[in-house]
Amino acid sequence: MQDSSLNNYANHKNFILMLIILFLMEFARGMYILSYINFLPTVTSIAVAITSLAFSIHFIADASTNFVIGFLLKKFGTKIVLTTGFILAFTSLFLVIWFPASPFVIIFSAMMLGIAVSPIWVIMLSSVEEDKRGKQMGYVYFSWLLGLLVGMVFMNLLIKVHPTRFAFMMSLVVLIAWILYYFVDVKLTNYNTRPVKAQLRQIVDVTKRHLLLFPGILLQGAAIAALVPILPTYATKVINVSTIEYTVAIIIGGIGCAVSMLFLSKLIDNRSRNFMYGVILSGFILYMILIFTLSMIVNIHILWIIALAIGLMYGILLPAWNTFMARFIKSDEQEETWGVFNSIQGFGSMIGPLFGGLITQFTNNLNNTFYFSALIFLVLAVFYGSYFIVNREKAK
């Protein structure tokens, strides 16, 4: 009994420390990717094309690394992989201090940061306890969201004081996360040293076995990301609000999401499978309705209400969807499978803005992008709703 209690305490301590490490790395990512490089064209000679390329390469590196990181963790162990990641992130962001306007350094740092964050995410997802998955996944996604947003806001404030003087803060945050890692005992589901060909065959096998999940993983990210390029224009040109009022809408949505992740996500645990199905299906349908409604809104107060509803639903849909995916994963393939899932999700987030921007540009109508995003959630609702009904009938 005492050994069990000590083991539970150790697992809890490791989980909390990994949450803090995830928060710090996402904090650094928010500072650099969402704030620093976006402001560079306004305060230095860096061209917008360079920062846009850096932004894209960051997420390409992230998605590509996710595809193989689970296998690398099993082959080389967590210490080598994570330490390498911290070295890459720290070194690349440290270079920004000395070369704040170098196109090569800006792009290189973005790529290295994308690679470095990948193993931390995979370890977090594979270490969640099954009987507490909804609750713990709420904490994981909360740490991710809080880190990104606070990092972005914090760097925005520092840039207002001086555009490049506080660049050292980014590498400092990574260094703190790196030091904390040495107080964590990370355990994988198993270790193997299989040859590369065998690991490639396993990637193909994992992909084939989870094809049912890929539409949901890919299209959810694409549908949300498709709105990113048009939302600022929609807010300022259609609703005619200030940047501050638009920011308030984002903050309200973030607060709703945070509250849902911290308090509502635990509802997923110890509930029936049908309850989980209901949350997922309701989430897809509600998203479709809310996003479609955005195309007709011209009042900022109604927009704030919709932002709150979207945030609340997102905060419970993510853990529910994660729990649904987890039921398909073999216990000894946690790291590999979550890595592949994260990679597919990353590609969805990359193609979403591309489609959203192109639809608006070629149709010259912002509403068409809202219709596109809403249609995706309608397709997901029909596809997975049909699966849930068929699966429920088979279970009887």
Curated annotation (Swiss-Prot):
Keywords: Antiport, Cell membrane, Lipid transport, Membrane, Transmembrane, Transmembrane helix, Transport, Virulence. Changing residue 345 to A: Rescues the growth defect of the deletion mutant in the presence of 5% CO(2). Flipping activity is inhibited by increasing concentrations of gentiobiose, a disaccharide with the same chemical composition and conformation as the anchor-LLD headgroup. Not inhibited by other disaccharides such as lactose, sucrose and trehalose at a similar concentration. Pathway: Cell wall biogenesis; lipoteichoic acid biosynthesis. Changing residue 29 to A: Lack of flippase activity. Cannot rescue the growth defect of the deletion mutant in the presence of 5% CO(2). Can rescue the growth defect under overexpression conditions. GO terms for cellular component: plasma membrane. The chain crosses the membrane at residues 15-34, 46-73, 80-99, 105-126, 138-159, 165-184, 211-231, 243-263, 275-297, 303-326, 338-358, 370-390. Disulfide bonds: none annotated. It is a multi-pass membrane protein. SUPFAM superfamilies: MFS general substrate transporter (SSF103473). Its main location: membrane. Disruption phenotype: Deletion mutant does not show a growth defect at high pH, but it shows very strong growth retardation at low pH. At low pH, mutant displays aberrant cell morphologies, including enlarged cells, defects in the formation and localization of the division septum and abnormal cell-wall shape. Inactivation of the gene causes structural changes in staphylococcal LTA but does not affect glycolipid synthesis. Mutants lacking this gene display a virulence defect in a murine abscess model. NCBIfam families: MFS_flip_LtaA. Proton-coupled antiporter flippase that catalyzes the translocation, from the inner to the outer leaflet of the cell membrane, of the lipid-linked disaccharide (anchor-LLD) that anchors lipoteichoic acids (LTA) to the cell membrane. Displays high selectivity towards the headgroup of its substrate. Plays an important role during infection. Contributes to S.aureus survival under physiological acidic conditions. Belongs to the major facilitator superfamily. LtaA family. Interacts with YpfP/UgtP, LtaS, and with numerous cell division and peptidoglycan synthesis proteins. This is Proton-coupled antiporter flippase LtaA.
